[in-house]
Each structure stands twice: as structure tokens, then as C-alpha cells.
Amino acid sequence: MKILLHETKRSRWSLLIWTAVISFMLGITVLIYPEMAPQMNEMTDMFADMGSFTAAFGMDQLNFGEFMGYFAVECGNVLGLGGALFAGITGITALVKEERDRTAEFLLTHPVSRTEVVKGKLLSVLAQISVLNLVVMGVCTLGVVAIGEKAALTAAFFLLFLAYYLLQLEIACITFGISAFLKKGGVAVGLGVGFGFYFLNILSNLTEEAEVLKYITPFAYCEGSYIVENKALDIPYITVGGGLTAIALIAGFWYYRRKDIS
């Protein structure tokens, strides 16, 4: 518990900044919808004529004339990519920063096992992601009520947030596992994982031959068009993502317990 609290306090400014920026951007996106609504049908027609471009971003199956169609795309742009980058950075720096800042030896001299250290740091990462998503969801919910779109507060609305929460957990856990193998740096790796998964999803939407990539990227189960239409999450992709998460965490725990830290 002490490690959890210490790590969370240590990362409070990063959490505050990321939460504030994502909440502000997505909140503004919601609040300007009434001004954008008259042009949304024209945008739907425009995107319909753009072929593979709209398919790549999953916009070919959404109706921008409805709030949920608009919000699903904007949520993916802001919370999807922004949250993925936050999760990647938070996960990758969790373990490596001790060696980078030369505090690892001091930390490990305390009467706690390496397993307890890793568990505490992992719980801190998960707690930070949970806080960010709860705040963002709260801000967006208040924004939807403020613009008079209460009818949009359906299962699909909250499932979008659940999907991106799971995405961030998966990316954070994968980068957390990777961080056990690193001695310094890591931020570029965390950003690379976030961007990499994002572009893999775009590629998987372009051709049928690339659809297999959907089983690799967590963005596959965050497709707004699928969630809005079916009011459900794509369980097969989530299951595969859970398996990748477990493998990364097990590998990270196993290696860090045996790692030569000097």
C-alpha cells in the first residue's frame, strides 16, 4: 500500500495534466455539438464519398447527423489516442525510472520483496488510468446533459468509455511488462506502442488481407461504429487482448525478480 501511495503521489502532476487536457478537449467537443449539428448531415455525405479514408478511421458506418455518431469519432480521436499515449508513458516509466534516477538500490534495501515493489507500481499505474477515465467520463456526461442530449446517455455511450478504459489498461500493462527489461529511457518506447497500435488499426481497416491485425491492436475493440450499432463490445478481440496483457505482465514479473539491478 505504501508503494502504491508513493508512486501515485510521485506521478500526480503527470496525471493531473493529462486528465485536464483530455477532459478539456473532449468536453469542448461535446459543448460545440449544437453549433456543429446543422452541418453534420453534409459531413456524413462528404465522408461517404471519400472511400478508403473514411474506412480507415471507421467513419464510413457512422451517422454524423446523430450525436452518438459524432461523439464516437471525436472520442476515438481524443480519448482513444490521447489515453493510449498516457497509458504507454505511464506503464513504460513505472519500473525503469528507478534505475534511470538511480533510486532502485535504495528502494530494494527496504524490507519488501521485488514482487511487492512490482505489484505496488502496477497498482499505481492502474489507479492513475482509472482516475483519468472516471474524470473524463464525468466531464462528458455533464456536457451531454448541458447541451440537452440526455437521450444519448445510453449503453453505447458508456460502453465507449469502457472500451477505451480497457484499451488503456492493455497498453499500460504491455508497456509495464516491457519496462522490466529496460535500464533507462523508455518514453519513446511507450509512445511507439501507443502510436503503433493506432496505426495498425488504421491499416487493418484498409484491406481485408490486413484484418488479422485487429487481433493485435486494442483499438479494434474500440470501433465506435460497432459499439454504437450493436450496443456491445467485440468480445473476441478483448479476449485476445487480455491474453497479450497477461503474457506481458507475467514476463515482466518473472524478469524483474531476477534482474541484476546496479
How would you label these PLM feature ranges?
Residues G88-L108, L122:
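Transmembrane helix boundary and interhelical loop/hinge segments in multi-pass membrane proteins
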